[in-house]
Design a protein with these regions (language model features):
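Structured secondary-structure scaffolds
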Residues: 2-49, 101-105, 131, 149, ...
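A charged helix-plus-loop insertion that forms the helical arch/lid used to bind
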Residues: 61-74
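Acidic, turn-prone loop/beta-hairpin segments
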Residues: 52, 372-397
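A non-catalytic, amphipathic alpha-helix used as a structural packing/dimerization or gating element
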Residues: 33, 71-82, 108, 356-363, ...
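Cys/His-rich microdomains that often coordinate metals
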Residues: 136, 153
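The −1 position to Zn-ligating cysteines in a subset of zinc-ribbon hairpins
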Residues: 112, 128, 135, 145, ...
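Flanking scaffold residues of small Cys/His-coordinated metal-binding clusters
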Residues: 123-124, 141, 160
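A broadly conserved sequence feature marking short terminus-proximal activation segments
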Residues: 72-128
Length: 397
């Protein structure tokens, strides 16, 4: 089959502070299904996933364990790769932000933005959420806590480099107006428009109170802040600024698939960075909802408390890979939150796989055995309706 063109899809790069949970698996299974479908349609697909390995939280966890940050992430990342292999995730590249190729790419991105006049040194004083690696103002907090994860924030004051995000506010609003499909679903887009319209502050992009990160090329007392580091992975993997033909072939990305808690970084910070660097913007960001347990987002902290129901490895052992994938793709409406429990999963498998599809398969096999000598006969006709259905299936999406 001749290629219909290129298709570049990415998951977020996951933070290896602990083993991944069912929410990460949900996102990755969706991306894998989209990549596989596009390949079946005849597209030349590039599917990227990976890990975001720098930051204060990793350094703190490594110190508590008595190992280096690199040793800490190496152990967790090995488990993530094993999980995706077990799940038969068909990624084309797995990028780690501690790789030399990425360090060079991030420093090149910093310098391009700096030379554009969009980075300056100042002092940050405000509120910081360590788990989210996010800075906030008092007005952005919800009940005095991080608006993304609901955890407490701490006061921070340090010298830092800043990106002139405020310079790109009007361009971002113009992007949402002229290309509403850039961010889906609509609820996420409306949230980001409101966020920009309330007034954007410049973005802190370096830290000087810890050293587990990529050094700022013009000032090695600073490490580059995690979001400038992490977001650049999408072009690092294509060999940006190295002459690699992959970048010319696959960029811009067709879709960044992310959880709703990081839509802001992908739909505001990332396009502003690319505007500063004079690079094309991705075609689309899609923000999926959360999987909820007891009315709360499934999280690593819940997994740490022994709630093994959200551990994908245990779910695979209990139900099988295909059943888990089917459930994740079938049960939830994209963009909306959904309830996850063992009972919900069992009900879906029994209704769909055992009753509907299982009974259909059983009856079909019985008829083939009874009337066709246990051999599937070749099709003898191909009606117009068959052709229409085949065309719809091939061209869907």
């Amino acid at each position: 089959m001749n290629s219909k063109g290129k298709y570049y899809i990415t998951t977020p790069i996951y933070y290896p502070s602990a083993n991944l949970h069912i929410g990460h698996t949900y996102c990755t299974v969706m991306a894998d299904a989209m990549a596989r479908f596009k390949r079946l349609q005849g597209y030349d697909v590039m599917f990227l996933t990976g890990t975001d390995e720098h930051g204060q939280k990793i350094q703190t966890l490594a110190d508590a364990k008595g190992v280096t940050p690199q040793e800490y992430v190496d152990e967790v990342v090995a488990g993530i790769i094993k999980l995706w292999e077990t799940m038969e995730i068909s990624y084309d590249d797995f990028i780690r932000t501690t790789e030399p190729r990425h360090i060079k790419s991030v420093q090149d991105m910093f310098m391009r933005m700096y030379e554009k006049g969009d980075i300056y040194k100042g002092e940050y004083e405000g509120l910081y959420c360590t788990p989210c690696e996010s800075f906030w103002t008092e007005s952005q907090l919800v009940d005095g806590k991080c608006p993304d994860c609901g955890r407490p924030v701490t006061k921070a004051k340090e010298e830092a480099y800043f990106f002139k995000m405020s310079k790109y506010a009007d361009k971002l609003l113009e992007l949402f107006r002229e290309k509403p499909e850039f961010l889906e679903p609509e609820t996420r887009r409306n949230e980001m428009i409101a966020f920009v319209e309330q007034g954007m502050e410049d973005l802190c992009i370096s830290r000087s109170t810890f050293d587990w990160g990529i050094p700022v090329p013009i000032d090695e007392k600073h490490v580059i802040y995690v979001w400038l580091d992490a977001l650049t992975n999408y072009i690092t993997a294509l060999g940006w600024n190295t002459g690699d033909e992959l970048f010319e072939k696959y960029w811009p990305a067709d879709v960044h698939l992310v959880g709703k808690e990081i839509v802001r970084f992908h739909s505001l910070i990332w396009p502003a960075m690319l505007m500063s660097a004079d690079l094309p913007l991705p075609k689309q960001v899609r923000g999926h909802g959360w999987l909820l347990m007891g009315g709360e987002k499934v999280s690593k902290s819940k997994a740490a408390k022994g709630q093994d129901v959200i551990d994908p490895v245990i779910l695979i052992e209990r139900y099988g890979i295909d059943a888990l994938k089917y459930f994740l793709l079938r049960e939830y409406t994209f963009g909306q939150d959904g309830i996850f429990t063992n009972e919900v999963m069992l009900r879906r498998m029994n209704f769909d796989l055992a009753n509907d599809l299982g009974n259909l398969l059983s009856r079909t096999v019985s008829m083939i055995k009874k009337y066709c000598g246990s051999e599937v006969p070749e099709a003898t006709t191909k009606d117009a309706i068959d052709e229409e259905l085949i065309e719809l299936a091939v061209n869907a999406g």
